[in-house]
């Protein structure tokens, strides 16, 4: 999940910074097919362990320091504040980019990446307070939130930013939409460790997982969008926009 937001820009950065003879070559502006193939190759071969020679950090599992999902709309049967801290995200290595749009010369244009993956599992400490389909829920402990057969769309846009005579892409807007085929949840230590209540709630959550995800999808997408806007801004601030692509002069 974490790397979805900046998969393409990270791959472009890798291809620019790689120094050895066998390194992948940068793609031309707007060459979606090239960008897609480059990224899929890099992720499948290097995401599990990383590759210092390619300047590619470990992506599977990936550390997620903190993420808050807040669903508080009064009309919704689900109203929760769910906080994940020091989690690990598994599944990046199996993701595949299936379509890329944008990444042309126009810095104000929209960029879009479509991705599919078998599973995404976010594992680690959590805190939750609120209600789920009218039932109260509270707890602090370990959690596992897994999404299966996920289709995701990442889109972002920006504006030119001139620094020291060079033009950078200043990313100003990023959105993520995820559509899993199914989702599964497990939260330990619910209701102050009451095992009976906790077990029943976990059963309830999974029996109603489709309805629960539908109610929380927008909140989940917003949380990831806010989190990774800063990440993508940081990637594009490293180099002038033109440096991410092959020299066509």
Swiss-Prot record:
Alphabetically ordered keywords of this record: Behavior, Biological rhythms, Secreted, Signal
Signal sequence span per UniProt?
1-18
From the Swiss-Prot or TrEMBL record, state where the protein is found.
Answer: Secreted
Classify the source by domain of life: Eukaryota
Induction and repression of expression: Starvation and circadian clock. In the heads of entrained flies, levels fluctuate daily and the cycle phase is delayed with respect to per and tim. Cycling appears to be linked to the endogenous clock rather than light stimuli.
Tissue expression summary: Expression is largely restricted to head, with limited expression detectable in cardia and crop. In entrained individuals, expression is observed in the brain cortex (region between optic lobe and central complex), photoreceptors and antennae. In asynchronous individuals, expression is seen in third antennal segment and male-specific expression is seen in the brain-associated fat body.
Disulfide topology: none
Q: Give GO cellular component annotations, separated by semicolons.
A: extracellular region; extracellular space
- Which coarse location class applies to the principal site listed for this UniProt protein? secreted
Q: Which GO terms describe its biological process?
A: adult feeding behavior; behavioral response to starvation; circadian rhythm; feeding behavior; male courtship behavior; mating behavior; response to starvation; rhythmic behavior
Any Pfam family: JHBP
Concerning its family, UniProt says: Belongs to the TO family.
Protein role = Participates in a novel circadian output pathway that conveys temporal and food status information to feeding-relevant metabolisms and activities. Involved in male courtship behavior. In the brain-associated fat body, transcription is enhanced by the dsx and fru male-specific isoforms and repressed by the dsx female-specific isoform.
What is the recorded name of this protein? Protein takeout
């Amino acid at each position: 999940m974490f790397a979805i937001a900046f998969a393409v820009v990270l791959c472009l950065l890798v291809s620019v910074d790689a120094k050895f003879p066998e390194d992948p070559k940068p793609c031309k502006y707007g060459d979606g097919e090239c960008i897609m193939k480059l990224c899929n190759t890099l992720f499948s071969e290097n995401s599990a362990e990383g590759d210092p020679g390619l300047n590619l950090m470990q992506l599977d599992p990936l550390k997620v320091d903190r993420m808050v999902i807040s669903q508080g709309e009064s009309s919704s049967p689900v109203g929760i504040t769910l906080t994940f801290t020091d989690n690990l995200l598994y599944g990046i290595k199996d993701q595949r980019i299936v379509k890329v749009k944008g990444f042309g010369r126009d810095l104000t244009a929209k960029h879009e990446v479509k991705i599919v993956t078998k599973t995404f599992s976010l594992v680690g400490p959590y805190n939750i307070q609120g209600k789920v389909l009218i039932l109260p829920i509270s707890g602090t402990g370990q959690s596992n939130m897994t999404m299966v057969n996920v289709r995701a769309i990442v889109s972002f846009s920006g504006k030119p930013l001139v620094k020291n005579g060079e033009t950078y892409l200043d990313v100003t807007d990023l959105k993520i939409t995820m559509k899993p085929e199914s989702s599964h949840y497990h939260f330990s230590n619910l209701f102050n460790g009451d095992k009976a209540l906790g077990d029943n709630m976990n059963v309830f959550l999974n029996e109603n997982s489709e309805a629960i995800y539908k109610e929380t999808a927008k909140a989940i997408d917003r949380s990831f969008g806010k989190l990774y806007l800063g990440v993508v801004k940081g990637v594009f601030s490293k180099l002038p926009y033109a440096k991410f692509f092959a020299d066509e002069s």
